[in-house]
Regions:
Chain A
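Catalytic core and acceptor-binding pocket of nucleotide-sugar-dependent glycosyltransferases
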Residues: 38, 116-233
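GT-A fold catalytic core of metal-dependent nucleotide-sugar glycosyltransferases
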Residues: 32, 36-111, 115-117, 122-132
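Juxtamembrane luminal stem/stalk of type II transmembrane Golgi/ER carbohydrate-processing enzymes
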Residues: 1-7, 49, 68-69, 75-80, ...
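N-terminal anchoring/stem segment of glycosyltransferases
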Residues: 1-50
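Hydrophobic/aromatic beta-strand patches that form the interior of the parallel beta-sheet core
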Residues: 20, 54-56, 110-111, 171-173, ...
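Short amphipathic alpha-helical segments and helix-helix/interface helices
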Residues: 9, 16, 40, 96-100, ...
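Short loop/turn segments at strand-loop or loop-helix junctions that form parts
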Residues: 1, 20-24, 115, 126, ...
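Aromatic-acidic/polar surface patches that form glycan- and anion
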Residues: 4, 8, 29-33, 112-116, ...
């Protein structure tokens, strides 16, 4: 059983919402990771005044709490600077490329990609009608019953390529902005590993490690965070 | 001969006093009138009096009076034999008294004359007011006789007609998979003509889309899903229009006097309902009650605002019916049209989804909560009545079937290509529509011929009896 973390951001205050995957109506045969979609919807219901919803997998740590989502990512100018335009949405060879003329304040969905696909464990959604449309479409039972290999990640990649109204609100940003890797497993993601000062570190793939475990990998970073808070940083 | 033989007015003269130029007065040779003239002369010293004086002095007239021409010699004889008209003096222009003016010659002295005179006088006194009233009436007539009334209906500020686009799906199949015989052509002609007339009358745009089977898509069944693509293309083609009304080919507008604005859109809240529990043939659970959904998605009627209605459909006995539906231009509609067809859903379901887009929409309505707050339903008989044979053979379901006494707006001969006679049905409804919408003159003529016929029949019956 895993829990994912949802952070709602409103101005300078943020709250964290820990959904329980069993709360949501998912069939027994469907992987539980699909629960993150209704969980975001749930957070939007519970926090009706929050603008940004930052979904973060539990195997990730916010290393630099000084950075705020508004300034670091979602600010209009900053987002327009960060946006990676005109690249295949789903690497390596998708024919659908990100749009190049999107305005920062019209973006409702910010996500990163690594060399294999979209990074689906760390993304930001802005509240609105589009968010409801996107989440409900993503959660359509037909996608779940299709049995995508990688579950909702593949479903996300599918709908982002097939439906222009979703692509029109999507921005890709560099991976290290909010999903730096703790270790480059495949060897292709050079430059995406965590460096001091990065916002978030993601421990994706730590459960597949043969020699160590997730707790082991995360331990030093926890210590660093604790010492940081002790020194009042 | 007239005295004025010479052209110069000084000597010939005489025009100042018309009495002198007439040769009939005193044609005895004495040309000077001597005393009484018929019209008084203003000045005393005139040519005539001068001539008279000189004639007196001289003793003879100053010109020859003899043999002055045929008419002069024989005038009296001729004039006495000419037909005489009772042209009273008072009628001539010259007559000062004008005793006959303002009198009706034939009706003189009768009561009718008095009435007519009084009426005439009243009209004359009120001529300005009557002119204004007449002007207004003429303008009114002119408005309706000329294309002005159609321009009014079409303009976006007055009638609002340009905000509506009727999309007619014609050429179904296009004769590719099946032969398109004379019946099919006739049905298409009738249907198109009916929609064209309606659109012209109210100023709507009519877009006739070709639904022939084309190898445009990778999978052949995808070809019947063109409603969605067509709707998108039409929305792009008419950027000013707000509402798009999709009509299948086998439909007929029975009452062209109803405009869409008056029939449906001026009071959208009353004409549609949003809670599907009002009539739920598919038994879709409504409203949604998952706790993770926001209040609007959980409410049975969305946000209760008329502006948020973006899609109006109707339900027949088996579910949603997309033979006649309305779509509004909005971002929500764009997203709906985008997500409607998806290869994952299509691949899994196209064999089960007999009605293609209809079933896909039902599935989306069921499973995706963002759709429900913006979809409204209207009563089927408001713009999608069925004929007997569809959803019931006898045609007596008051919720579904066309009722003549209620003058339903549109008949959708759904499913007529399976087992029924499409041409017969559309012909029957066309005749019915023409009969119901006769103008008063035709009604009068029909009443006369009907009464003659019934009189004849009753007479024949009596003869048979006796």
């Amino acid at each position: 059983m895993w829990q994912s973390r949802r952070t709602g951001k409103n101005m300078r205050r943020s709250t964290t919402f820990f959904p329980n995957e069993n709360d949501y109506p998912i069939e027994k045969t469907t992987p539980k990771s699909w629960a993150r979609i209704p969980a975001i919807r749930h957070a939007m219901t519970l926090y009706p005044y929050t603008t940004y919803f930052f979904y973060l997998d539990y195997r990730a740590l916010i290393m630099n709490p000084e950075l705020s989502i508004e300034e670091h990512i979602m600010d209009t100018k900053r987002l327009e600077d960060l946006m990676i335009t005109d690249v295949p949405v789903v690497p390596p060879d998708s024919v659908i490329k990100t749009f190049s003329h999107l305005k920062g304040d019209r973006i409702d969905f910010v996500i990163t990609q690594d060399k294999e696909g979209l990074v689906h464990n760390s993304f930001i959604i802005r509240r609105g009608e589009w968010a409801k449309y996107f989440l409900d479409a993503w959660f359509d039972p037909l996608y779940r019953s299709y049995n995508f290999q990688k579950g909702e990640q593949h479903a996300l990649e599918h709908i982002v390529q097939w439906h222009g109204t979703i692509l029109a609100k999507l921005a890709l940003i560099p991976q290290r902005t909010m999903a730096s890797l703790y270790k480059d497993h495949s060897g292709k993601n050079v430059g995406a590993t965590y460096k001091e000062g990065d916002f978030v570190i993601s421990f994706e793939g730590c459960d597949k490690e043969k020699t160590s475990s997730c707790e082991h990998e995360m331990a030093p970073f926890f210590k660093a965070l604790e010492s940081q808070s002790e020194t009042g940083g | 001969m007239s005295l004025s033989r010479s052209p110069s007015p000084q000597r010939g003269g005489g025009w100042s006093s018309p009495g002198l130029t007439t040769p009939y007065n005193g044609s005895s040779g004495r040309s000077s009138p001597m005393g009484n003239h018929s019209n008084g002369i203003a000045n005393n010293i005139t040519w005539a009096s001068a001539q008279a004086r000189s004639a007196e002095i001289k003793g003879y007239p100053s010109f020859s009076t003899r043999n002055q021409g045929f008419f002069h010699r024989h005038l009296r004889k001729i004039s006495s034999s000419l037909p005489q008209f009772n042209h009273t003096d008072s009628r001539s222009y010259a007559e000062k008294e004008k005793l006959g003016r303002g009198r009706w010659p034939l009706l003189h002295g009768t009561k009718i004359e008095a009435i007519l005179t009084r009426v005439g006088r009243i009209i004359w006194r009120m001529r300005l007011r009557l002119a204004i009233v007449l002007g207004i009436i003429l303008l009114w007539i002119g408005f309706y006789v000329t294309p002005l009334h159609r321009m009014y209906r079409r303009s976006p500020w007055f009638g609002g007609g340009s905000k509506f686009v009727i999309i007619l799906a014609a050429n179904q199949g296009g004769g590719v998979m099946e032969w398109k015989g004379p019946r099919e052509w006739a049905i298409e002609r009738d249907s198109v003509r009916n929609k064209k007339k309606y659109a012209k009358k109210w100023g709507y745009d009519l877009e006739i889309v070709d639904m022939s089977t084309k190898k445009r898509y990778a999978h052949e069944w995808r070809e019947s899903w063109e409603k969605v693509d067509t709707l998108r293309i039409t929305m792009r083609k008419y950027p000013d229009a707000e509402w798009f009304w999709w009509l299948d080919l086998n439909t007929f507008i029975m009452e062209p006097s109803y405009s869409l604005q008056s029939h449906m859109f001026n009071n959208l809240a009353k004409n549609t309902y949003r809670d599907i529990n009002h009539y739920n043939p598919l038994h879709i659970p409504h409203p949604l009650n998952d706790t993770y959904l926001d209040l609007e998605s959980r409410s049975p009627t969305g946000d209760n605002k008329t502006e948020s209605i973006n899609f109006i459909i109707t339900q027949d006995c088996g579910g949603f019916n997309l033979g006649s539906f309305f779509a509004k231009r909005s971002t929500w509609t764009d997203r709906l049209l985008d997500i409607w067809w998806d290869p994952v859903g299509y691949e899994q379901k196209h064999m089960q989804w007999e009605h293609k887009e209809q079933d896909a929409l039902e599935s989306m309505y069921r499973n995706q909560p963002w759709i429900r707050p913006h979809v409204a339903f209207f009563e089927q008989r408001k713009a999608n009545s069925f004929p007997p044979g569809a959803c019931g053979d006898r045609g007596d379901d008051p919720k579904i079937h066309y009722q003549e006494k209620d003058r339903d707006f549109l008949v959708n001969m759904a499913g007529c290509e399976w087992g029924r006679d499409c041409w017969g049905e559309i012909y029957k409804y066309r005749q019915l529509s023409n009969r119901l919408n006769r103008n008063p003159w035709e009604k009068f003529k029909d009443w006369i011929s009907d009464s003659i016929r019934s009189a004849r029949q009753s007479r024949r019956k009596e003869e048979k009896k006796s």
